[in-house]
UniProtKB/Swiss-Prot annotation:
The lineage of its organism: Eukaryota, Viridiplantae, Chlorophyta, Mamiellophyceae, Mamiellales. Phosphorylated. Phosphorylation upon DNA damage induces relocalization to the nuclear plasma. This is Flap endonuclease 1. Pfam families: XPG_I (PF00867), XPG_N (PF00752). Its EC number is 3.1.-.-. Its main location: nucleus. It comes from Micromonas commoda (strain RCC299 / NOUM17 / CCMP2709) (Picoplanktonic green alga).
Length: 384
C-alpha cells in the first residue's frame, strides 16, 4: 500500500526532492530492486486477457517470469546493474493490513463470479486483477532466473524495501527501486520509481532524494515517520480525517504524534483504540534487514544454457526467442567495442530537472514556514 498521498504531498511541499531521469541516464547505476512488489505487478498485467493469465502448455502461470526476464534484459542493455531483493516474513504488525487485503481479495473473487455470470467483460478484467496471489514458488522461480542472469539476489529477513534501503545507505547501490513510497520511511538516500515500467509507456524514472525531502519539509527523520503514520501506512491504522496536509501541519506545529494527541479534538478526529503508532515507528527506524557489513555485490555474465534450460526446458518458452533476446543483450553490451565496455563499468554523468506541481517557494520558504528544497544545479557525478 505504501503511504497514502505522500507523492502529492512531496510534490506540493518539497518539490526539490524530486527529479525526473531518463532510463538511459541510469547507465552504470547499481540499484536494489523490490522484486516481490514487481512480481505482483507483472502477474496482474503481463499477458493478461480478461481473467486469463499468461501460462505455458502445462497451465503454469508464467507472467512473472516473462515480465522479469524482459525488464531485466532491458536494464542490462542500458548498463544498469540490478540487485533483486525479495520479501521475507512480514512483521507481525502488518497482519492487520494483510488480513484486509485477504478480505478484499475474497470480496473481489465473489464479485468476479457475478461478473462472469453477467458476461460483463470490463468488470471481469478489473476484478480478476484484484484476485492475484503471489506464491512462494513464484518468488523462487524469479530468484532462480535472476541468478542465471548473473545478478545478486537476496531474500530479506522481513520487508524487501527495508533491505533495499539498507543496501543504499551502506553505499552498495545508488538507489532503492520500488513503487512503494514507504521505502522513504526507511531513510533510503535515493528512491527510484518507474524503473521497471514497460518501455512502451516511455515513463521517466522519478527519483526522490531523502536529504532534500527532509530539508524541504523542515522535518527530522522521526518527524517524517510520524507524518507518514498519520497519512496511513501498512503497520497501523491512521486517525481518520486528518489526511496528508494536516498531518504535515500538525507535526510541524506540535513536534510529534504525542504532542498532537495532547491538543487534538478527539471528537472530530477519533484516535484508534490501543493505537500502536510507537511500534510502527520502531519498524521504520530499526527494521530487520540483510547485514551489509563486509558485504560485496557481484554481477556475472548470464549463463545462457541455464536460462534456456529453465525457461524453455522447464517452462516451455520459445527457445529461438529467448536465445535471440540473450544475443541482443550480448550485442548491446559489446556495441562500440572496448569503449562501450568501459562505459558500462566506468563513470558517466546525467542531467537533472526538478519535478513538482508547484514552483519552488521563494527564498526557501514553503507552506507552514517550511524551507523548500534546493533545486538541482544540473550535472551530477556518478558514485556507483
Amino acid at each position: 500500500m505504501g503511504i497514502k498521498g505522500l507523492t502529492k504531498l512531496l510534490s506540493d511541499y518539497a518539490p526539490g526532492c524530486m527529479r525526473e531521469q531518463k532510463f538511459e541516464g541510469y547507465l552504470d547505476r547499481k540499484v536494489a530492486i523490490d522484486a516481490s512488489m514487481h512480481i505482483y505487478q507483472f502477474m496482474m498485467v503481463v499477458g493478461r486477457s480478461g481473467e486469463q493469465q499468461l501460462t505455458n502448455e502445462a497451465g503454469e502461470v508464467t507472467s512473472h517470469l516473462q515480465g522479469m526476464f524482459t525488464r531485466t534484459l532491458r536494464m542490462l542493455k542500458a548498463g544498469i546493474k540490478p540487485v533483486y531483493v525479495f520479501d521475507g516474513k512480514p512483521p507481525t504488525m502488518k497482519g492487520g493490513e494483510l488480513a484486509k487485503r485477504k478480505d478484499k481479495r475474497e470480496a473481489a473473487e465473489s464479485a468476479l463470479e457475478k461478473a462472469k455470470e453477467a458476461g460483463d467483460q470490463e468488470e471481469i478484467e478489473k476484478l480478476s486483477k484484484r484476485t492475484v496471489r503471489v506464491s512462494k514458488v513464484h518468488s523462487e522461480e524469479v530468484m532462480k532466473l535472476a541468478r542465471f542472469l548473473g545478478l545478486p539476489v537476496f531474500e530479506a529477513p522481513c520487508e524487501a524495501e527495508a533491505t533495499c534501503a539498507a543496501l543504499c545507505k551502506a553505499g552498495l547501490v545508488y538507489a532503492a527501486a520500488s513503487e512503494d513510497m514507504d521505502t522513504l520511511c526507511f531513510s533510503t538516500p535515493k528512491l527510484a520509481r518507474n524503473l521497471m515500467a514497460p518501455s512502451s509507456q516511455e515513463k521517466p524514472i522519478l527519483e526522490f532524494d531523502f536529504d532534500k525531502l527532509l530539508a524541504g519539509l523542515e522535518l527530522t527523520w522521526d518527524q517524517f515517520i510520524d507524518v507518514c503514520i498519520l497519512c496511513g501506512c501498512d503497520y497501523c491504522d491512521s486517525i481518520k480525517g486528518i489526511g496528508p496536509v494536516n498531518a504535515l501541519k500538525y507535526i510541524k506545529q506540535y513536534g510529534n504524534i504525542e504532542g498532537l494527541l495532547e491538543h487534538l479534538d478527539k471528537e472530530k478526529y477519533p484516535v484508534p483504540d490501543d493505537w500502536p503508532y510507537k511500534e510502527a515507528r520502531v519498524l521504520f527506524k530499526n527494521p530487520e534487514v540483510v547485514q551489509t557489513d563486509g558485504l560485496t555485490l557481484k554481477w556475472t555474465a548470464p549463463d545462457e544454457e541455464a536460462v534456456v534450460a529453465f525457461l524453455c526446458g522447464e517452462k516451455s518458452f520459445n527457445e529461438d526467442r529467448i536465445r535471440k533476446q540473450l544475443a541482443d543483450l550480448k550485442k548491446a553490451r559489446s556495441q562500440g567495442g572496448q569503449n562501450r565496455l568501459e562505459t558500462f563499468f566506468g563513470a558517466a554523468t546525467v542531467k537533472s530537472s526538478t519535478v513538482g506541481k508547484r514552483k519552488e517557494p521563494e527564498k526557501g520558504k514553503g507552506k507552514f514556514g517550511a524551507a523548500g528544497g534546493k533545486k538541482s544545479k544540473g550535472v551530477t557525478k556518478r558514485k556507483f
